[in-house]
Amino acid sequence: MTSSCVVLVADAHLGDASAIPEEAFHRFLCAVPDLGDELLINGDLFDFWFEYRSVVPRRHFGTFAQLHELRRRGMPITFVGGNHDRWGGDFLRRDVGIAFYGGEAELTLAGRRAFVAHGDGLTEQHLSAKLLHRVTRHPATIGLFRTLHPDLGLWLAKKLSGHLADGNGDGAVRDQAARAQAEFACSLLKRRAELDLVILGHTHRPALQCLPGNRAYVNPGAWLDGFRYALITNSEVELRRFEP
Protein backbone atom coordinates (compact mmCIF):
# COMPACT_ATOMS: atom_id res chain seq x y z
CA MET A 1 0.00 0.00 0.00
CA THR A 2 1.37 3.43 -0.98
CA SER A 3 1.88 5.82 1.92
CA SER A 4 0.17 9.20 1.72
CA CYS A 5 2.56 11.09 4.02
CA VAL A 6 6.17 10.19 4.77
CA VAL A 7 7.91 11.53 7.88
CA LEU A 8 11.58 12.23 7.08
CA VAL A 9 14.27 12.67 9.74
CA ALA A 10 18.08 12.60 9.71
CA ASP A 11 21.17 13.34 11.77
CA ALA A 12 19.92 12.77 15.31
CA HIS A 13 23.35 11.41 16.36
CA LEU A 14 21.85 9.61 19.34
CA GLY A 15 24.54 8.60 21.80
CA ASP A 16 26.63 11.72 21.33
CA ALA A 17 27.04 13.10 24.85
CA SER A 18 26.85 16.68 23.55
CA ALA A 19 23.64 16.09 21.57
CA ILE A 20 19.98 16.24 22.58
CA PRO A 21 18.92 13.43 24.98
CA GLU A 22 17.30 10.40 23.38
CA GLU A 23 14.05 10.97 25.31
CA ALA A 24 13.16 13.86 22.99
CA PHE A 25 13.56 11.61 19.97
CA HIS A 26 11.47 8.92 21.66
CA ARG A 27 8.65 11.46 22.08
CA PHE A 28 8.98 12.23 18.39
CA LEU A 29 8.68 8.53 17.52
CA CYS A 30 5.52 8.32 19.63
CA ALA A 31 4.10 11.23 17.61
CA VAL A 32 5.05 9.85 14.18
CA PRO A 33 1.72 7.99 13.62
CA ASP A 34 -0.10 11.32 14.04
CA LEU A 35 2.25 13.03 11.56
CA GLY A 36 2.28 10.49 8.73
CA ASP A 37 1.98 6.84 7.76
CA GLU A 38 5.61 5.99 6.93
CA LEU A 39 8.96 6.86 8.54
CA LEU A 40 12.18 7.46 6.60
CA ILE A 41 15.42 7.81 8.59
CA ASN A 42 18.11 9.21 6.31
CA GLY A 43 21.31 8.40 8.14
CA ASP A 44 23.20 9.19 11.32
CA LEU A 45 20.32 8.28 13.59
CA PHE A 46 23.11 7.16 15.92
CA ASP A 47 26.46 8.77 16.55
CA PHE A 48 27.76 5.24 16.05
CA TRP A 49 26.08 1.96 15.25
CA PHE A 50 27.76 -1.28 14.25
CA GLU A 51 25.87 -4.55 14.06
CA TYR A 52 27.55 -7.65 15.43
CA ARG A 53 26.33 -11.13 14.52
CA SER A 54 25.24 -12.18 18.02
CA VAL A 55 25.55 -9.10 20.26
CA VAL A 56 23.26 -6.06 20.38
CA PRO A 57 24.82 -2.99 22.09
CA ARG A 58 22.56 -1.96 24.98
CA ARG A 59 23.10 1.80 24.53
CA HIS A 60 20.17 2.25 22.15
CA PHE A 61 17.75 -0.36 23.48
CA GLY A 62 15.04 2.25 24.15
CA THR A 63 15.21 3.60 20.61
CA PHE A 64 14.97 0.15 19.05
CA ALA A 65 12.07 -0.71 21.34
CA GLN A 66 10.21 2.37 20.07
CA LEU A 67 10.99 1.54 16.44
CA HIS A 68 9.88 -2.06 16.94
CA GLU A 69 6.61 -0.86 18.46
CA LEU A 70 5.98 1.34 15.42
CA ARG A 71 6.54 -1.66 13.19
CA ARG A 72 4.23 -3.78 15.36
CA ARG A 73 1.54 -1.17 14.77
CA GLY A 74 2.04 -1.45 11.02
CA MET A 75 4.17 1.64 10.36
CA PRO A 76 6.65 1.08 7.47
CA ILE A 77 10.16 2.23 8.42
CA THR A 78 13.10 2.69 6.08
CA PHE A 79 16.60 3.44 7.37
CA VAL A 80 19.32 4.59 4.95
CA GLY A 81 22.65 4.40 6.77
CA GLY A 82 24.94 7.40 7.15
CA ASN A 83 28.65 7.75 7.75
CA HIS A 84 28.09 7.03 11.47
CA ASP A 85 25.68 4.09 11.20
CA ARG A 86 25.83 2.36 7.82
CA TRP A 87 26.89 -0.99 9.33
CA GLY A 88 23.47 -2.52 9.95
CA GLY A 89 22.18 -5.95 8.99
CA ASP A 90 19.86 -8.75 10.06
CA PHE A 91 19.09 -7.32 13.50
CA LEU A 92 17.58 -4.22 11.93
CA ARG A 93 15.90 -6.06 9.08
CA ARG A 94 14.62 -9.21 10.79
CA ASP A 95 14.38 -8.45 14.50
CA VAL A 96 13.30 -4.80 14.38
CA GLY A 97 11.55 -5.09 11.01
CA ILE A 98 13.17 -2.09 9.33
CA ALA A 99 14.00 -1.87 5.63
CA PHE A 100 17.71 -1.04 5.97
CA TYR A 101 20.06 0.19 3.23
CA GLY A 102 23.76 0.62 3.88
CA GLY A 103 24.05 3.16 1.07
CA GLU A 104 21.94 5.09 -1.39
CA ALA A 105 18.53 3.75 -2.43
CA GLU A 106 15.75 4.52 -4.87
CA LEU A 107 12.35 4.36 -3.21
CA THR A 108 8.72 5.21 -3.90
CA LEU A 109 7.56 7.67 -1.24
CA ALA A 110 3.97 8.92 -1.18
CA GLY A 111 3.69 7.87 -4.82
CA ARG A 112 6.83 9.77 -5.86
CA ARG A 113 10.08 8.21 -7.10
CA ALA A 114 12.97 9.31 -4.88
CA PHE A 115 16.75 9.01 -4.85
CA VAL A 116 17.71 8.80 -1.17
CA ALA A 117 21.25 9.02 0.21
CA HIS A 118 22.67 10.32 3.45
CA GLY A 119 25.02 12.48 1.42
CA ASP A 120 28.50 11.54 2.60
CA GLY A 121 30.74 10.54 -0.29
CA LEU A 122 28.80 12.63 -2.81
CA THR A 123 30.37 16.06 -2.43
CA GLU A 124 33.48 15.64 -0.23
CA GLN A 125 35.95 18.46 -0.76
CA HIS A 126 39.11 16.83 0.62
CA LEU A 127 41.03 13.75 -0.44
CA SER A 128 41.18 12.54 3.18
CA ALA A 129 37.37 12.56 3.42
CA LYS A 130 37.04 10.64 0.15
CA LEU A 131 39.59 8.09 1.37
CA LEU A 132 37.83 7.68 4.73
CA HIS A 133 34.54 7.14 2.92
CA ARG A 134 36.04 4.30 0.88
CA VAL A 135 37.86 2.70 3.82
CA THR A 136 34.85 2.61 6.16
CA ARG A 137 32.70 0.98 3.45
CA HIS A 138 35.26 -1.65 2.49
CA PRO A 139 34.35 -5.26 3.43
CA ALA A 140 37.85 -5.88 4.82
CA THR A 141 37.53 -2.94 7.24
CA ILE A 142 34.10 -4.12 8.37
CA GLY A 143 35.32 -7.70 8.83
CA LEU A 144 38.35 -6.59 10.83
CA PHE A 145 36.25 -4.38 13.12
CA ARG A 146 33.85 -7.27 13.73
CA THR A 147 36.71 -9.35 15.18
CA LEU A 148 37.12 -6.84 18.03
CA HIS A 149 35.34 -7.43 21.32
CA PRO A 150 32.21 -5.21 21.26
CA ASP A 151 33.32 -3.25 24.34
CA LEU A 152 36.65 -2.47 22.68
CA GLY A 153 35.06 -1.78 19.31
CA LEU A 154 32.51 0.66 20.72
CA TRP A 155 35.18 2.40 22.82
CA LEU A 156 37.35 2.79 19.74
CA ALA A 157 34.42 4.08 17.68
CA LYS A 158 33.64 6.68 20.34
CA LYS A 159 37.23 7.92 20.17
CA LEU A 160 37.11 8.09 16.36
CA SER A 161 33.58 9.47 16.01
CA GLY A 162 34.84 12.94 15.15
CA HIS A 163 36.82 11.57 12.22
CA LEU A 164 33.70 9.88 10.83
CA ALA A 165 32.24 13.36 10.39
CA ASP A 166 34.65 13.98 7.46
CA GLY A 167 35.48 17.45 8.80
CA ASN A 168 31.76 18.19 8.61
CA GLY A 169 31.72 19.87 12.03
CA ASP A 170 33.10 23.12 10.64
CA GLY A 171 30.36 25.60 9.74
CA ALA A 172 32.04 26.86 6.59
CA VAL A 173 32.65 23.30 5.41
CA ARG A 174 28.99 22.45 6.02
CA ASP A 175 27.80 25.51 4.13
CA GLN A 176 30.00 24.65 1.16
CA ALA A 177 28.86 21.03 1.28
CA ALA A 178 25.22 22.17 1.38
CA ARG A 179 25.73 24.22 -1.78
CA ALA A 180 27.45 21.28 -3.47
CA GLN A 181 24.58 18.99 -2.45
CA ALA A 182 22.01 21.33 -4.00
CA GLU A 183 23.99 21.40 -7.24
CA PHE A 184 24.28 17.60 -7.21
CA ALA A 185 20.54 17.18 -6.58
CA CYS A 186 19.44 19.59 -9.31
CA SER A 187 21.86 18.02 -11.77
CA LEU A 188 20.55 14.54 -10.94
CA LEU A 189 16.94 15.63 -11.39
CA LYS A 190 17.83 17.20 -14.72
CA ARG A 191 19.55 14.03 -15.94
CA ARG A 192 16.91 11.60 -14.71
CA ALA A 193 13.41 12.57 -15.70
CA GLU A 194 11.89 9.57 -13.88
CA LEU A 195 12.94 10.95 -10.47
CA ASP A 196 10.57 13.21 -8.54
CA LEU A 197 12.68 13.75 -5.42
CA VAL A 198 16.29 13.82 -4.28
CA ILE A 199 16.60 13.41 -0.50
CA LEU A 200 19.91 14.01 1.28
CA GLY A 201 21.22 14.70 4.79
CA HIS A 202 24.72 14.89 6.31
CA THR A 203 25.34 18.66 6.13
CA HIS A 204 22.96 19.46 9.02
CA ARG A 205 21.65 22.29 6.81
CA PRO A 206 17.90 22.20 6.01
CA ALA A 207 17.12 22.76 2.35
CA LEU A 208 14.07 22.65 0.13
CA GLN A 209 14.34 23.45 -3.55
CA CYS A 210 11.17 22.98 -5.59
CA LEU A 211 11.38 22.49 -9.34
CA PRO A 212 8.70 22.49 -12.05
CA GLY A 213 6.68 19.33 -12.47
CA ASN A 214 6.19 18.64 -8.76
CA ARG A 215 9.86 17.74 -8.31
CA ALA A 216 12.09 18.76 -5.40
CA TYR A 217 15.36 18.44 -3.54
CA VAL A 218 15.04 18.20 0.24
CA ASN A 219 17.41 17.95 3.18
CA PRO A 220 15.43 17.97 6.45
CA GLY A 221 18.37 19.37 8.41
CA ALA A 222 19.64 17.79 11.61
CA TRP A 223 17.24 16.51 14.26
CA LEU A 224 19.85 17.48 16.86
CA ASP A 225 19.65 21.10 15.64
CA GLY A 226 16.22 22.17 16.83
CA PHE A 227 14.25 18.90 16.32
CA ARG A 228 14.07 19.29 12.54
CA TYR A 229 12.20 16.92 10.26
CA ALA A 230 10.18 17.04 7.03
CA LEU A 231 6.90 15.76 5.64
CA ILE A 232 6.52 14.41 2.11
CA THR A 233 3.15 13.96 0.40
CA ASN A 234 2.23 13.33 -3.22
CA SER A 235 2.08 17.05 -3.91
CA GLU A 236 4.15 18.79 -1.23
CA VAL A 237 7.35 18.73 0.80
CA GLU A 238 7.39 20.67 4.06
CA LEU A 239 10.24 21.42 6.48
CA ARG A 240 9.16 21.32 10.11
CA ARG A 241 10.32 21.42 13.73
CA PHE A 242 9.00 19.11 16.43
CA GLU A 243 7.83 20.47 19.78
CA PRO A 244 8.87 17.80 22.34
Where are these regions (language model features)?
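Active-site metal-binding loops of divalent metal-dependent hydrolases
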Residues: 10-13, 44-45, 83-84, 119-120, ...
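Beta-strand-turn-beta hairpins that frame and shape the catalytic cleft
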Residues: 1-7, 107-115, 211-216
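Conserved beta-sheet core of the metallophosphoesterase superfamily
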Residues: 95-102, 115, 120, 124-132, ...
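Hydrophobic positions within alpha-helical membrane elements
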Residues: 16, 49, 87-88, 123, ...
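Active-site-proximal loop/helix segment associated with metal-binding centers of metalloenzymes
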Residues: 119-181
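Core catalytic region of metal-dependent phosphoesterases/phosphodiesterases
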Residues: 2-5, 14-109
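Residue-level marker for buried hydrophobic side chains located in beta-strands
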Residues: 6-8, 39-41, 115, 199
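Short, basic/glycine-rich phosphate-binding loops at helix/coil junctions
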Residues: 4-11, 44-46, 155-168
